[in-house]
Amino acid sequence: VVATVPLTTLDASKQKEGTAELLGNQGSQGQELRIDTRPMSSGSGYVEVWLINTDGKRMVSLGVLSGTEATFPVPPDALAQGYTIVDLSREQYDDRPQHSGDSIMRGTLPV
């Protein structure tokens, strides 16, 4: 484990709802992100895992979280380029691939 970050709600309470662990060698290819959360509601859609850039504008989807835990490959150089904010969002089944704006929890990797 290279880094671990708590995933907390975005409201004022900042309740810890899960963790994200960066696996693999720091700065190397082949890193993975392991997500482990409490059960949560996806509403009528699904939960998607994102890496958001520190500029708050750019982001990349890592995939869909089915259940409460999963491991996702991290794109090469994503962390070095500032994609260190882990975000879980509720998404709808629609034809829009971008982030819905409905974040459930978030944490920033200390890398």
Language-model-detected regions and their locations in the chain:
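N-terminal targeting/export leaders
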Residues: 1-111
